[in-house]
């Protein structure tokens, strides 16, 4: 099954690589239109996934990731149209020149080929990844979690029908809809056809891919994100940043998980924060000093464990740690962070610069919410993933991250001396 799927994807990728930008945009436009026209059918299938998720006792955070609404579906269609508006990186000359030998040489962006994406309870990823891959001339094999089987099946049908309407091979976008985990293992070994594996999910999924894949893997997505409130920060403004970073959409990987507060302002700042977040149902997990302050402020708080400091909650749980100074904050991030998104709230330019220089993360923020780590927010369009590694791509992966390059060399029957 997967051998055939891989061959079909490879053949489709050859065709996609030859397409003009206009041809790719035409296909994307039809996909966006079909998402809107088929919305009742898509939402009906998604409702089946939601019902099964509730029956199986999945968490509210997972169900939120799984849920499609009319508004979210319209947002997905709009994201596809935004990808249309983005510059096509394929064929772009990165650099070049003429050598002493007279050989003209250029480095030109090209598609990667076939992308394999493994993800969990996020049906929106199906369209996000498909649209980015199509724009960059890549074929894609998608494997969503068993929680999304009904949603993914109908979304793939919509996309494949749109591709055929555009005169393109429907096998440019394929999905493994069988929930058998053995098929994931087979996909990870399909290096004859697949050029890159992009996992989107928890740490367990990323470890599985790293350990078993014979194909290059993009590692990332797990976000134990920190925000450090330094003593010179504007406390009233800082509270709103923390509120946004923690409560706007807790299930995302760019959500704040651990709040670090400088010791000298903790007794003043933390009660203000608790009061502000009182209606948000935030549950705090704190150490020693922070634990006592939060208890006195009437917060719903318990003692944090070492394991929880490394945990991506994906919920309204928030770790709180009081640190002595910026050095202690940076050391805590070094020990517990996942190199995703880290933020400092401060009025000191020198401390902000120190934080930027010393914190190793895909995205580092000064006086801003970590929630901005997103392809759309960064102006990249829908993202295929957020990479926390350093090779090939880092941070939100938009169009350019789905390309490679080739050296194009032109001569006048030139030979090397």
UniProtKB/Swiss-Prot annotation:
GO terms for molecular function: glutamate-5-semialdehyde dehydrogenase activity; NADP binding. Its EC number is 1.2.1.41. Pathway: Amino-acid biosynthesis; L-proline biosynthesis; L-glutamate 5-semialdehyde from L-glutamate: step 2/2. The keyword 4Fe-4S does not apply. It comes from the Bacteria. It is found in: Cytoplasm. Pfam families: Aldedh. Its main location: cytoplasm. InterPro entries: Ald_DH/histidinol_DH, Ald_DH_C, Ald_DH_N, Aldehyde_DH_dom, G-glutamylP_reductase_CS, Glu-5-SA_DH, GPR_dom. It catalyses: L-glutamate 5-semialdehyde + phosphate + NADP(+) = L-glutamyl 5-phosphate + NADPH + H(+). One of its GO terms (biological process) is L-proline biosynthetic process. Keywords: Amino-acid biosynthesis, Cytoplasm, NADP, Oxidoreductase, Proline biosynthesis. It is an enzyme of class 1 (oxidoreductase). PROSITE patterns: PROA. The keyword Transmembrane does not apply. GO terms for cellular component: cytoplasm. Belongs to the gamma-glutamyl phosphate reductase family. Catalyzes the NADPH-dependent reduction of L-glutamate 5-phosphate into L-glutamate 5-semialdehyde and phosphate. The product spontaneously undergoes cyclization to form 1-pyrroline-5-carboxylate. This is Gamma-glutamyl phosphate reductase. It comes from Haemophilus influenzae (strain ATCC 51907 / DSM 11121 / KW20 / Rd). The gene is proA.
């Amino acid at each position: 099954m997967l051998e055939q799927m891989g061959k079909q994807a490879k053949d489709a990728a050859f065709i996609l690589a030859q397409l003009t930008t206009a041809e790719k945009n035409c296909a994307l436009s039809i996909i966006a239109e079909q998402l809107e026209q088929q919305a009742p059918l898509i939402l009906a299938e998604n409702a089946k996934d939601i019902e099964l998720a509730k029956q199986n006792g999945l968490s509210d955070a997972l169900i939120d990731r799984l849920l499609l609404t009319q508004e979210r579906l319209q947002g997905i269609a709009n994201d596809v149209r935004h990808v249309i508006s983005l510059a096509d990186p394929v064929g772009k000359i990165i650099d070049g020149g003429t050598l002493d030998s007279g050989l003209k040489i250029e480095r030109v962006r090209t598609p990667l080929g076939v992308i394999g994406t493994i993800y969990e309870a996020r049906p929106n990823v199906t369209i996000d990844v498909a649209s980015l891959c199509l724009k960059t001339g890549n074929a894609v094999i998608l494997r969503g979690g068993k929680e999304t089987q009904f949603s993914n099946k109908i979304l793939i049908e919509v996309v494949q029908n749109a591709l055929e309407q555009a005169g393109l091979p429907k096998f440019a976008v394929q999905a493994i809809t069988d929930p058998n985990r053995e098929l994931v293992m087979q996909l990870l070994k399909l290096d004859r056809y697949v050029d890159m594996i992009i996992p989107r999910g928890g740490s367990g999924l990323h470890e599985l891919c790293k350990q078993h894949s014979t194909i290059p893997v993009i590692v990332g997505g797990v976000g134990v994100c920190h925000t450090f409130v330094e003593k010179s920060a504007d406390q009233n403004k800082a509270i709103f940043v923390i509120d946004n970073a923690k409560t706007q959409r807790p299930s995302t990987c760019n959500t704040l998980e651990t709040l670090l507060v400088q010791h000298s302002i903790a007794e003043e700042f933390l009660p203000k924060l608790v009061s502000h977040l009182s209606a948000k149902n935030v549950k705090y997990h704190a150490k020693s000093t922070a634990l006592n302050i939060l208890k006195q402020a009437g917060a719903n708080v318990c003692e944090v464990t070492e394991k929880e400091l490394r945990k991506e909650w994906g919920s309204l749980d928030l770790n709180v740690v009081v640190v002595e100074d910026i050095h202690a904050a940076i050391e805590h991030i070094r020990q517990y962070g996942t190199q995703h998104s880290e933020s400092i709230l401060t009025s000191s330019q020198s401390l902000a610069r120190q934080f930027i220089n010393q914190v190793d993360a895909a995205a580092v923020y000064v006086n801003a919410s970590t929630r901005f780590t997103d392809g759309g927010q960064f102006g990249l369009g829908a993202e295929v993933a957020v990479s926390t590694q350093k090779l090939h791509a880092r941070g939100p992966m938009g169009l350019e991250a789905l390309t490679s390059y080739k050296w194009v060399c032109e001569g006048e029957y030139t030979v090397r001396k």
